Amino acid sequence: MDAIQEAIDTVETLRKRITNISEDAMDLLFREARTHNAWTDTPVTDTQLLELYKLVINGSTSGNCLPARFIFCRTPEAKSRLIPCVNPGNVAKLEAAPVCAIIGYDTMFWEHLPQLFPHRDMTAQYRDNADHAETAAFRNGTLQGAYFMLGARAMGLDFGAMSGFNNKA
């Protein structure tokens, strides 16, 4: 069986087994979901972060491009390096959080497409057009960031999405 048919069969099997998620799960992920501004002092372990990463890394993107890159800052030293990058109103939130996840993207993601999307070579459209690669990386990395937040919540963790930072810092 080829990879495309195998993927189709996997989704069809899942759809037969799981027709929808519970109302409680929909509330948790969407209807009652809000960005948090305060944290408990409960630590988030490396095991939890790895589990979260594995849960969300293959979420659907255009052509399986998967450009997101994740950096986790947990120690006071790591967080102190971020302070110059965040707006003053976000410093206390950053310091109080058990972990800060930086979700970025790699504009050279296309180098991995032969493994991620093996049934069709899509590298030329990005290799030969840096602007297109940047746009695709931003768009699809943003999707992966959203998957990360939903995955965190599904695992019993929470997040405070932060856009108040200085890109030039």
Region roles according to the model:
Residues 1-169:
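Acidic, surface-exposed loops and disordered segments
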